[in-house]
Amino acid sequence: MTAALEEGNVYALADYYFMNGSAYACVDMDEMMTVYYERTRRLLQNTGWWKEYEQGLYYNMGATYLAVGRYEEALDCLNRVRSEDFLLCHKKAWLHLLLGNTREADHYFAIMKQLLSRKDMKGKMAERLMYEELCMEQKPDFTADPAYLDLIERLIRALIKEKSFGFLYQYKNVILEAYTRQRKYKKALEFSEQISTKTRKSTL
């Protein structure tokens, strides 16, 4: 950061802000995320570099606002993302379920199902389990279902293997709820400690 300020290197400074914003987004620290992403946006908005950051910035903001319950802001950010890939459709389906917009959620479930049928998605177990998990969330009292616990543990393993920590972090609350409701208290404690340790490392 010091070198960027001394040299007046706008791109390097914006990249520093973006990385900080992304680190806070990874652990759902929405206020700090917003501070750094807004700095990124202000620096780059009128430059040719903005397109390089814009889509990732709005996706991360939308996903984080979704995680902390700021649903209208989440929808606004996610609607600014142009490419309808699996992860965006997953977040939009999840958000519309929480908002009670069944028709809109079904639209994105259909797109996810279609995307998962493509050859290039064949080996992506994390995405398949994310889709199955969200389908199960539509059922009443799903965290008390032993089948859900089995699914979420398979998802945990897939996310650890295939994705960054932020993907696992987004499920922390529902995982802990499932463990607690099904009296898996030791597993709940172990998972909570694992998340806490990685969160501290992510924000150092």
Question: Which residue ranges define each predicted feature?
Answer:
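Residue register of alpha-helical TPR repeats
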Residues: 15, 56, 87, 94, ...
